[in-house]
Design a protein with these regions (language model features):
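Active-site scaffold of zinc-dependent metalloenzymes
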Residues: 43-73, 85-88, 93
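Hydrophobic (often cysteine-bearing) scaffold residues that line and stabilize catalytic clefts
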Residues: 16-21, 75, 121, 125-128
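Short alpha-helical catalytic segment bearing the HExxH-like zincin motif
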Residues: 73-81
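Metalloprotease/metallohydrolase-associated module, dominated by Zn2+-dependent proteases
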Residues: 32-38, 46, 92-142
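Zn2+-dependent metallopeptidase catalytic core
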Residues: 13-36
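Hydrophobic or amphipathic, alpha-helical segments that drive membrane association/targeting
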Residues: 1-11, 32, 38-49
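N-terminal intrinsically disordered, low-complexity tails enriched in polar/charged
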Residues: 1-20, 113, 142
C-alpha cells in the first residue's frame, strides 16, 4: 500500500501525526478492503469536524483529518474515514457533491447541516462504521 501524508504548506509537518496516520492505514489495510494508494491530508476543518473521506475515479483516495486534533485524537477519525473509504471502494457507498448518498443501491438526500448529529449517526453507512470501528481499532492497536 502506498500512503502519502500531506500537511498544509504554511505549517510544519508533525512527524508523530504522520507516523500514526501511516501506521493506521497500513494495519487497517490488512483488515479492510482499501485502495492501493491513499492520501491522508491534515487540514484546518474548523470546530466540530474531525475528518472526511473522498473516493473518486482515478487517483483521488483522500482522507482529510482536522489539523487541530492531537496525536491521540486522530486515531478515531482516521479509522472512521478508512471504513468509509472501504465502503466507497467496495461500491457500498457513493456520495455526490449535491448531498446525494447511495448506500447499497438505495438513494438518500441528506443535508448534514439540517439534521441532528444523532440522526446523521443513525444513517446506514454511519451505523455500519459504528459497528465496525471498535473492532478495527482493537485489531490495529492490539
Amino acid at each position: 500500500m502506498n500512503i502519502k501524508i500531506v500537511f498544509p504548506k504554511h505549517s510544519q509537518p508533525d512527524i508523530a501525526k504522520a507516523t500514526i496516520a501511516e501506521r493506521l492505514c497500513q494495519v487497517a489495510s490488512l483488515c479492510l478492503n482499501l485502495p492501493d494508494y491513499i492520501e491522508v491530508h491534515f487540514a484546518n476543518l474548523g470546530p466540530g469536524t474531525y475528518g472526511e473521506a473522498i473516493l473518486k475515479p482515478g487517483i483521488n483516495r483522500v482522507i482529510t483529518v482536522n489539523l487541530d486534533l492531537s496525536v491521540k485524537e486522530i486515531i478515531y477519525p482516521i479509522t472512521h474515514e478508512l471504513i468509509h473509504l472501504s465502503q466507497m471502494y467496495e461500491g457500498k457507498l457513493a456520495i455526490s457533491r449535491t448531498g446525494l448518498y447511495v448506500w447499497e443501491g438505495k438513494t438518500y438526500q441528506v443535508d448534514p447541516a439540517k439534521i441532528s448529529y444523532k440522526e446523521y449517526m443513525n444513517l446506514p453507512w454511519e451505523s455500519d462504521v459504528t459497528l465496525r470501528q471498535k473492532t478495527l481499532i482493537e485489531q490495529i492497536i492490539g
